[in-house]
Amino acid sequence: MQKSRILIASALALSASVTVGAYAQDGGFDVSQQIGPDPVLPEPQADLMPDLKVASVVGWKDGETPAVPEGLKATVYAKDLANPRTVHTLPNGDVLVIQSKEPAKSAPTRPKDIIRGWIMSISHGSGSAEQKETNLITLLRDTNRDGQVDERHDLLTKLDSPFGVAWIDNTLYVASASAILAYPYELGQNEITAAPRVLTPLPGGPINHHWTKDLALSPDGKMLYVSVGSNSNAAENGIEAEKGRAAIWQVDRQTGAARVFGSGLRNPNGLTFNPQTGELWTVVNERDELGPNLVPDYMTSVKDGAFYGWPWSYYGNHVDVRVRPPRPDMVEKAIPPDYALSSHVAALGMTFTMDSALPAAYANGAFVGEHGSWNRDSFNGYKVVYVPFENGKPSGKAQDVVTGFLDGENARGRPVGLGIDGTGALLVADDAGNTVWRVASSDGNVIPQPIGTDRVSANPQASADATTAPGSTNEVPGAADQPSPRTDRPSQPAQMQTAPAGDPMPTAAPAQ
């Protein structure tokens, strides 16, 4: 106990000194230079501790809503939630809200880890959310499609830090902190009482530095894709702790057979398929402690077998000299992401807009939820932005769409996961404000029928051919073109049987 007190005291003292010095480091850097396919990357700063500026959560007052541009209207969809992280629309229009908190971990011993834990507790607020039960999935039902929730049911409770979900064939898949679980569930049910089966284990504790596991269903309905964040900032816990991490796994939903699909992604979330191209996309939180203006978080398509740099490099061949031993071979393999969002915005949610009921200005692109910075002296993020697309790729600057989460030095809330509800409006999960916001067209426009988050085509290749970007002559890459999981590895791979990020997975005998 005395040792812990000494560590905490020294850590806080160190953080105070770093905070004072940090105000000279930002230098009025224009973060807009880091938005787009070719971000400005300043020289890294070798800081003992990152800059610290934490927005204390004060919550939303009655009647307050986020700010949106003309042509849009923001309203409360559901409130009094307990750390809502993600939202997911079922084919019948019901919306699932996944609420969770960080799982228990081994006690930190390094001063910087103690500080990080302290910062995270401040940035997520306190009060009613801490007293309410979390780690549950709540169903919200808008029976007459007027944009207001008429029924609310807790579908599952007492889960292990859930985050991502997917639904197909009367089965609800839930990605928890340590496994993908499969629950029998028919649309319209108000509760789930059956026990789940474990589809596949996922890398978990005791460190579990990035614990959120997002989930997406392939357009052909055969595969699940799950994000597994790194176990550290920049491999300071050793590369062995990163086996199977900083990656997106592909999982056969029938057998649980799994393989690493894309790697070198420090903390991927917001998994979603572009409905026009069939490509998998994600948003990624990049590394810290290289200064307030490095490294930009990003959104990117994820290619089968591609390596995106972490931990050895960022944005292609920009080497992180902190990582030992160096791996020039891995740096050479690293490919840059598609689109930078600027440094430390903490992008956690993403959804495409092609089939929404939003105005034409938002008809062909993606929304990104930026949870907000804590490690630079000027706040960055704390908003939802819109990135326009053309021919399957981002084609312009990100535009602020949902703002007002900051109130001076405090935060009313923090956006996380995004989705499109059964009427075609945008939903924003606000884990600090314990609210799901609905952003709709102010003219009341709605889509004719609900479209679920999981878009499954009966004929994936025909669907892909029909949605090929204008001018494209190649077949559209998508889940239908992806190789099936190999059968020479366990159907439920253990964490240590998965290779370090970026290296090929070892061959293993089938599970008995």
Model segments located where?
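Gram-negative bacterial Sec-dependent N-terminal signal peptides
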Residues: M1-Y23
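Compositionally biased, proline/threonine/alanine/serine-rich low-complexity intrinsically disordered stretches
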Residues: V31-S32, P448-Q512
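Surface loop/turn motifs at the tips and blade-to-blade linkers of beta-strand repeat domains
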Residues: V76-L81, H153-D160, L199-I207, V260-G264, ...
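Hydrophobic core register within WD40 beta-propeller blades
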Residues: V87, V165, L215, P268-L271, ...
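Residue-level detector of Asp-centered blade-edge/turn motifs that repeat once per structural unit
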Residues: L90-G93, W167-D169, L217-G221, N274-T277, ...
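Conserved beta-propeller blade signature
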Residues: D94-L96, T171-V174, L181, M223-S227, ...
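Asp-box/WD-like beta-propeller blade repeats and closely related beta-sheet repeat scaffolds
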Residues: Q148-T171, S176-S218, N233
